[in-house]
A protein has these predicted regions:
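Positively charged n-region of N-terminal signal peptides that target proteins for export
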Residues: 1-5
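Bacterial N-terminal signal peptides
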Residues: 9-18
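Oxidative protein folding and maturation machinery
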Residues: 23-182
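Short active-site neighborhood of thiol/selenol oxidoreductases, capturing the structured segment around
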Residues: 184-214, 229-231
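A structural signal for short secondary-structure junctions
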Residues: 189-190, 223-225, 262-266
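Thiol-based oxidoreductase modules, predominantly thioredoxin-like and allied folds used
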Residues: 223-241, 249-259
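Short, internal strand/loop/helix patches
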Residues: 243-276
Length: 279
């Protein structure tokens, strides 16, 4: 499954070792339970990873017994995630569905799971980061019957942000507060490429990036030739944006929208759109 290659090597090492005889169990990191042994007949890494994804939680009572060793649970869950890199997508999807159906019956274990989804799976600095995996869990948790509605809404909202911001997604049209190109909205811009720059108060790197982009001779030339438009995007109170219009680069468009609808985990947050306004 194509998730994040950054931890593929680690996963490969684990699945090759899984099921082999051990002279001694490592003292650390601790896990919740002893992992199942992979049958010797499964020799290919993908087959071994599939087995671990399918059977890792078989003997864990996720439904009735609340986890008390948080570190061990974290180690076990991230090991589970690491197998995804080598496993088939269909196997991963089926396993996540089964896991959620079980863990949804225990609020404590479910909350621990959600905590790791946000600390590791959604974290761009984590080796387990994967928007695809987060969305799989979010969709299954949202479909579960016994899960708190507020938690479902939180996960669904985050999944929607990821969907809005994914490569290939079409950015919804929004009005422009200022447009040197004479366009009323984003869709009115006819350049082959449009850059959305999301302003962020207090972000020094964002300010530096904006200064450099506005001073770029290459970017200015492309704008003059009609090949590029740059939209300076603000969030918050539209009235507060009025005072900032005069400070914007003269050849940039300006917009004020609900910026929370777009992924800004990485700052400066910059989106490059094609002529169809696809990311």
């Amino acid at each position: 499954m194509k998730i994040r290659n950054i931890f593929t090597a680690a996963a490969l090492a684990v699945v090759i070792a899984a099921g082999s005889a051990r002279a001694a169990e490592p003292a650390a990191p601790a896990t919740l339970f002893e992992y199942p042994s992979v049958p010797d007949k499964l020799t290919k890494p993908a087959m071994r990873a599939n087995f671990m994804v399918e059977h890792l939680w078989d003997k864990c009572d996720l439904e009735k017994t609340a986890v008390t060793d948080l570190a061990a649970f974290h180690n076990t869950f991230t090991d589970y995630l690491s197998f995804f890199a080598l496993a088939d997508k269909a196997v991963v999807e089926k396993s996540i569905k089964k896991y959620v159906e079980r863990v949804a019956k225990n609020p404590t274990n479910l909350n621990l799971t959600v905590g790791i989804l946000h600390s590791d799976v959604l974290n761009l600095r984590s080796q387990y980061c994967s928007d695809e995996v987060y969305t799989m869990f979010a969709d299954n948790i949202a479909a579960a019957k016994k899960v708190d509605k507020a938690l479902k809404a939180k996960l669904q909202a985050q999944a929607a942000v990821l969907a809005n911001s994914a490569v290939g997604a079409t950015v919804a049209d929004f009005p422009l507060r200022q447009s040197p190109a004479g366009a009323a909205s984003l869709y009115g811009l006819t350049a082959g490429t449009t850059i959305l720059f999301f302003n962020s108060d207090g972000c020094v790197d964002c300010s530096i990036y904006k200064v450099r982009l506005s001073a770029s001779i290459a970017a200015s030339s492309l704008i003059k030739e009609g090949h590029l438009r740059i939209v300076s995007v603000y969030g918050g109170d539209p009235a507060a944006v009025e005072s900032k219009l005069a400070t914007e680069p003269a050849d940039w468009e300006v917009a004020c929208i609900d910026t929370a609808a777009y992924d800004q985990r990485l700052r400066p947050a910059v989106y490059v759109l094609d002529s169809d306004k696809k990311i």
